[in-house]
Structure formats: C-alpha cells, structure tokens
Curated annotation (Swiss-Prot):
It is found in: Nucleus. It holds the Pfam family SPX. Induction: Up-regulated under phosphate starvation. This is SPX domain-containing protein 2. Residues 1-162 form the SPX domain. Keywords: Nucleus. Residues 36-61, 194-213 are annotated as: Disordered.
Amino acid sequence: MKFGKSLSNQIEETLPEWRDKFLSYKELKKKLKLMEPRSVENRPNKRSRSDSNSVDTDPTVGMTKEELDFISLLEDELEKFNSFFVEQEEEYIIRLKELKDQVAKAKNSNEEMINIKKEIVDFHGEMVLLMNYSALNYTGLAKILKKYDKRTGALIRLPFIQKVLQEPFFTTDLLNTFVKECEAMLDRLFPSNKSRNLDEEGEPTTSGMVKTGTDDSELLRVPKELSEIEYMESLYMKSTVSALKVLKEIRSGSSTVSVFSLPPLPASGLEDDSWKKKVGVLEQVAK
C-alpha cells in the first residue's frame, strides 16, 4: 500500500481531535505537481568545496516560486508538529502525576480499581499513539522530500532531515519513559497482568474473584468484572492498533536501511502483541 493511502487510513482511525495535526501529505504532493520538472542542464549544480565555504550558501537561491511555496509549507508543517507534540507532552506530565496521586490514595474497592486501570490503559494508549504520530510524520517528510529532490534535482532532503532529527516532535525519550512508568504501575497494582490471560489461567472463586495461583499467598483478588472490560473497543486501542499496523506496512515496504530510514521505536514491545499484555488488554473478551 502506498504511504499516502496508509497515512490517510491512519488519520481516519485516530482520535478526532488529532486528525488535522498530521502531515498535509496530499497538499504537499499537489504543490509538487505544480513544479515543472527540471531538465538535467537546468538542475542546480553541486557546490564545490570552495563554493560551500562561501558566504552565499542560501539553499533557496535559484528556486522557483512553486519550490519556495513547497518549502514554506514544509516549515509550517514542522511548526505544527512541534506545537502539538510539546503541548501533548506537557499535558502528559500533569496527567501522570495526577494518576500517581490517584493510585496512592486509592482504596481497595473493585469499582475504583477498575476505573484506575482503565485510566492508565487509556493514558498508555494515547502516549503510544503520540510516539507513532512522531514516526509517521517523520516518514512522510522523508518520502515527500525524496519526491522533491527527484523532480527538481535539488538535494535538500539530507539537510532538512538532519534538521528534523533535532526537532521536539522527533524526540520521544520522555514519552517512552512515561509509557514504561504506566506499565510498571499496572504491574504493581494488578500482578495478574504478568500472566497470559486471566480467563485462560485463572479460576473464578465464589466471591467473584479470580485465583491465579495454587498457594493462598498467591491468591490475587482481581474483580472478575475487570477481565470483562472490552478494552479492544476503546478508541485509544483501535487507534493504536491501526497506527502500529501502518508502521509495520511502512517498514516492510523497503529492506534498504539508510539515513532516511524510519528509526526503530524504543524497545518496549510496542510493535508486537506483548505490549497489550503489559496493560492487561484481553484479546479474547470473556462472554
């Protein structure tokens, strides 16, 4: 599947309030088509070493109006990514602290624990979505710049991508830390997350709890209702699964690794089904 179609599908599946925050890939392609392909003799010459050390190194010199419009839109897109990403990160810092406070004050009522777990799962899913947002937009930029270089003969892709690597939206270290903190919270609150599936391994007791061990010391009193929450119906879950599917399609599209290749996500099991187990998502919902 072509990247444009994959991106379009992802935008349709994502959170409604996020849909206008992704790369305007179609608009960039339209601007690209307005440019007249340059013949070999009219293409920019590679700078010599002496030229590259000169004062006049403005990459926009010699560009047509259409090319300048394209570059301007790219810069606007970067600003859009950064603004949205930083805003989300700042919100997540506050939300994580509130969640930790909520967990610390939580009583052992079944309803309260179910609500806390759902909040953590949704928060985890939204952060994974933002990590994928970063990777998808990076990929889109690399692909549209490749098309630009091919059409104009210019060589702006490498310097532009080098700039992108330093942008806030591309830096997901803090997000990855938050994701792992959420997983750690779930493991502490609900040790049963470490098992494969409560419905497969556990036995319901007369009190409506689920027993996962043979020793009384290993009796995990998890509300049976908890295993029946259909997290796969969660909007966060649907969006996240869709995003991961798109990224898998993108990565499988080329076996060649280069400076422009999509960087791997931090190693936290996000690209396979193991991350679902970490947040206690049941793939086979109890009937």
